[in-house]
Curated annotation (Swiss-Prot):
<protein>
    <recommendedName>
        <fullName>Fatty acid binding protein 1-B.1</fullName>
    </recommendedName>
</protein>
<dbReference type="GO" id="GO:0005504">
    <property type="term" value="F:fatty acid binding"/>
</dbReference>
<dbReference type="InterPro" id="IPR031259">
    <property type="entry name" value="ILBP"/>
</dbReference>
<dbReference type="InterPro" id="IPR012674">
    <property type="entry name" value="Calycin"/>
</dbReference>
<dbReference type="GO" id="GO:0015908">
    <property type="term" value="P:fatty acid transport"/>
</dbReference>
<dbReference type="Pfam" id="PF14651">
    <property type="entry name" value="Lipocalin_7"/>
</dbReference>
<comment type="similarity">
    <text>Belongs to the calycin superfamily. Fatty-acid binding protein (FABP) family.</text>
</comment>
<dbReference type="GO" id="GO:0033993">
    <property type="term" value="P:response to lipid"/>
</dbReference>
<keyword id="KW-0963">Cytoplasm</keyword>
<keyword id="KW-0446">Lipid-binding</keyword>
<dbReference type="InterPro" id="IPR000463">
    <property type="entry name" value="Fatty_acid-bd"/>
</dbReference>
<dbReference type="GO" id="GO:0005829">
    <property type="term" value="C:cytosol"/>
</dbReference>
<comment type="function">
    <text>Binds free fatty acids and their coenzyme A derivatives, bilirubin, and some other small molecules in the cytoplasm. May be involved in intracellular lipid transport.</text>
</comment>
<dbReference type="GO" id="GO:0005634">
    <property type="term" value="C:nucleus"/>
</dbReference>
<keyword id="KW-0813">Transport</keyword>
Amino acid sequence: MSFTGKYQLESQEGFVEFMKAVGLPDDMIEKGKDIKSVSEIEENGNQFKVTVTTGSKVLTNSFTIGQEADIETLTGERVKTIVNREGNKLKVVLNRITSITELVDANTLVNTLTLGGLVYKRISKRVA
């Protein structure tokens, strides 16, 4: 299955605790917890461009599977890392955070971020 498409956040679990652990200020956590972000993924072979729009904030990362890339994190920090693909999963380690994005079916994208024992899970549905 191709990741290409636009996905809108439907539900999330563990947002507040996870964002506190990564050092996001309380006011930003409060503003962000109810915003339904939109993720747009463009897949062309092993090349990906991921754009996440949350309110007025737009975060865009481009990478090639298996090659080092400069990725911007949720907190605005830039990290050199490698994104790997395992079937319908994209896996990347950003400092202490492990992110797994899985296309569980043609219309559902699940992003699970893990930091120590904390888990932040985002479930998005395809809108285009």
